[in-house]
């Protein structure tokens, strides 16, 4: 009976650990400077290709069509 109780306890402990890892991995976010997407969000700031505090607009020459 003692062996059965121990194996059931170990089994339940493994299930609890797997649930904990799932919560940690699914709520993962990225710090500033790391690549991000809408599905892999930034911990703080906003996603501009990489996690940043502010997205800066790139102003410059526009590309021209060449034939």
Curated annotation (Swiss-Prot):
Predominant localisation class: secreted
Task: Extract the Pfam families matched here.
Answer: Conotoxin_I2 (PF17557)
Which positions correspond to the propeptide?
63-67
Q: Source organism's superkingdom?
A: Eukaryota
| Matching InterPro entries | Conotoxin-I_CS (IPR013141), Conotoxin_I2 (IPR020242)
Would you indicate the residue range of the signal peptide? 1-26
Could you give a GO molecular-function term held by this entry?
Answer: toxin activity
Identify the tissues in which this protein is expressed.
Answer: Expressed by the venom duct.
- GO CC annotations? extracellular region
Q: Which cysteines are joined by disulfide bonds?
A: 29-48, 36-51, 42-43, 47-55
* Compartments reported by the entry: Secreted
Which keywords does the record carry?
Answer: Amidation, Cleavage on pair of basic residues, Disulfide bond, Ion channel impairing toxin, Neurotoxin, Potassium channel impairing toxin, Secreted, Signal, Toxin, Voltage-gated potassium channel impairing toxin
Q: Please report the PTM annotation for this entry.
A: Contains 4 disulfide bonds. Here are reported disulfide bonds proposed in [PubMed:16268797], even if the connectivity known for the framework XI is I-IV, II-VI, III-VII, V-VIII.
User: Where are the Isoleucine amide residues found in this chain?
Assistant: 59
Member of which family? Belongs to the conotoxin I2 superfamily.
Task performed by this protein: Kappa-conotoxins bind and inhibit voltage-gated potassium channels. This toxin inhibits the mammalian potassium channels Kv1.1/KCNA1 and Kv1.3/KCNA3.
Miscellaneous note of the record:
Negative results: has no effects on Kv1.2/KCNA2, Kv11/KCNH, and Kir2.1/KCNJ2 potassium channels, and on Nav1.5/SCN5A sodium channels.
Domain commentary = The cysteine framework is XI (C-C-CC-CC-C-C).
Question: What is this protein called in UniProt?
Answer: Kappa-conotoxin ViTx
The species is: Conus virgo
Gene behind the chain: VITX
């Amino acid at each position: 009976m003692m062996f059965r109780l121990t194996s059931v306890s170990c089994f339940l402990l493994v299930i609890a650990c797997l649930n904990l890892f799932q919560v940690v991995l699914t709520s993962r976010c990225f710090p500033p400077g790391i690549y991000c997407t809408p599905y892999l969000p930034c911990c703080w700031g906003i996603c501009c290709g990489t996690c940043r505090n502010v997205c800066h607009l790139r102003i410059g020459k526009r590309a021209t069509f060449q034939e």
